[in-house]
Structures are given as C-alpha cells and as structure tokens.
C-alpha cells in the first residue's frame, strides 16, 4: 500500500491520502487511469488510516525532494484531520515545503470556514478554478454541492489569501483560449495569481 499513498511524478513527491471527492470533473485523469507517475495504483481498497500514512512516510525515500504535495485520486481536504496531522508529522522530520492542491470546496465539505487552519498546515495552496463562471464550472466540475460551489470556491481562495502569501488558481489549457483569458480576469479581480497548466491525459 505504500506506493499508493506516496508517489513521485515529474520530480515531485505527492501524498495520496484519500479517494473521496465531491466532484466528478469531466477531464479528471482518474476516470481513465489507475495511476500516474511512479505509482502502481492510486485506488485504495480502504481509506488509509493515519498510522498507515505515517508508515508510508517512514519507509519512503525522499532523496532530492524539496516539496511534498497533497494531491492524489481524491480531494485531500475530505481527509482534513489526517491532512493536518500528516503536515505536522512532516514538519517535525523534514525541511520540505508543503503544498496543497485542492478543489477549494473545503468549507462546503465541513460546513464551516477552514481556510485559517489549512493555511497554518501548508506553505502554498493551488486551487482548481477550472472555469471562469458558475455555469461552465458546474458543467465541467459537476460538484456535489451544486450551484453554490463556484462562489464557495472563490471565497475559500480569498480567505486563504488573508493567511498565506502563496495562493494561486489553476486552469487547464484544454478549456480553450477564451475561457483561459476570462479566468485570468476573474483571478485578477480576486487578487490571486493564475497558473495555466498543460493538459496531460
């Protein structure tokens, strides 16, 4: 199970701590592949317990690593307690930067504001903007929380920016040039940088 919890991809180390996700994004790689990078399988037979994640960390070779990323075949904030504990565990043992890749729906998942505690646990946050407007977002992301998801994601991003300098939005270039340009405008309006990622199926 160790390989599934921690894996390397493009010279970075990723923590896959849950398979739970409130979204069904049309472009999500987990729709077509069982793994990416050096992982053999990112689908869990059961959700990993905290002790299993610790064991995976203790056994993993972090050579040449300077940043770990919470990102896998699930939304990391679905396992928020484990995320917080694992971040603390890493910080006590390694000098790594810690990044969270998230859909930004943590407040809806937990029915409360979560930005402050999350920002205390990580060094940077990358939030999947995905689309520049609510209608397009709902069509592509298909969030379990419906129409309120888009505004909740934007609010979460703005809240994070109050506590952490390194917060950014991301979109994938497959959405098209027009949507990318609109996303740049929206990101600027919210005072948050935007990174355009190349789609790699």
Locate each region found by the language model.
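Canonical Radical SAM [4Fe-4S] cluster-binding loop centered on the CxxxCxxC motif
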Residues: 3-49
């Amino acid at each position: 199970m160790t390989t599934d919890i921690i894996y390397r991809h493009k010279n970075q180390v990723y923590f896959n701590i849950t398979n739970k996700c409130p979204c069904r994004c049309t472009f999500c790689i987990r729709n077509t592949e069982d793994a990416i990078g050096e992982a053999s399988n990112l689908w869990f037979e059961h959700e990993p317990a905290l002790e299993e994640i610790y064991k995976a960390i203790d056994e993993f070779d972090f050579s040449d690593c300077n940043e770990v990323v919470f990102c896998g075949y699930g939304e990391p904030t679905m396992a928020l307690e484990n995320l917080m504990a694992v971040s603390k565990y890493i910080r006590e043992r390694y000098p790594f930067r810690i990044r969270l890749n998230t859909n930004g729906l943590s407040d809806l998942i937990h029915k409360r504001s979560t930005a402050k505690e999350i920002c205390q646990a990580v060094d940077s946050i990358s939030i999947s903007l995905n689309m520049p407007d609510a209608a397009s977002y709902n069509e592509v992301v298909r969030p379990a929380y419906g129409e309120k998801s888009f505004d909740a994601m934007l609010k979460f991003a703005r809240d994070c920016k109050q506590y952490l300098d390194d917060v950014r939005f991301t979109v994938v270039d497959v959405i098209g040039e027009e949507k990318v340009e609109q996303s740049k405008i929206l990101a600027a309006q919210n005072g948050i940088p935007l990174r355009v990622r190349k789609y790699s199926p």
